């Protein structure tokens, strides 16, 4: 039976970067990955580098290796460097980039919107090629001599306690085998399947299951790859706002239409309504679906303490939905530091936990209240959302990608009109006063 210092389940950015950082510290590690080829995206992902200052505890910058081309993009083959201002890591990314400069949240019938942008229009995010980036990280893993086992599922993990380490039971192409490691890093993504076998998901609040389908479409009228748009109102067919943003690498001229449903509102039905019956149906008269991706995400409250015994859970596996690529890289660096200390008999996992809790916004106890900023539909009627968004006319909010900062900004701007709302629309004011208990699960269960 093979024995390692560290076993890592999952070859996403967090797992790969953990291995890279560990190998540079002289640790013997192995990565177990269920996919055959990580350079091919089989599950939908937004693929953005977020540039907001102190977004999830860090400010990311990108040293772009070329000027924008005639299409307003950074071309394929460009050497770029992604940098963490707060934690100090640098990672090279060779590939295309497309800037995101404006975000619009539209009310019913496109009458009003919440607009996020910087005055000089500098980007608050870059669309990148995640599949290519993962392959580049894997190339580093292989160059460092780290063992990488693909097409393999870890179906059970057992913490043997103390110095005995962890026993992993795996299967590849119908053949079962076992291995041992002194420490285990669970980096399998939002499904957190290994954590589940260890009972580490017990006690996490379950919010909802989101069925997400993305349609990459050519020929969408009015589409701008530098814009990210959300459409709020039942007239658009969904309780959860349809989103439209930048298409995939190599096809930034395609729109990325994202529809989030649940068993009572399946994505295909939402697609048909949005593209054929909604106020924006005219945009799709000559559009063509070029490619589709989907995923199912179970939204759980984050793990406040993401370790147990010899097992550390990192990245999306411990998060509320996702940490984004940059957050996963941070987790990878912290994990490597923690593992080195743990193997030296020091409390590295405690230090990781402290950093985890302080860094990611979703660990704030007020997260449920922030969620309510997005629970507009069906709590508010379409007409009431139109009224609320009308209060934002002639207002441009700071450029923001954050799913936590954006609703705060929007509601702060709306609350500047509290006296007006109370006078003009007592019905809306009553709902605002009672909104705190509304969450995403309310929107997605109706």
Regions found by a protein language model. Give the residues of each.
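N-terminal Rossmann-like FAD-binding beta1-loop-alpha1 element of flavoenzymes
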Residues: 3-31
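Conserved acidic E/D residue at the C-terminus of a beta-strand in Rossmann-like folds
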Residues: 31-36, 316
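Predominantly flavin-linked oxidoreductase catalytic cores and closely associated redox partners
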Residues: 140-280, 319
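Active-site-proximal substrate-binding core of FAD-dependent oxidoreductases
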Residues: 337-384
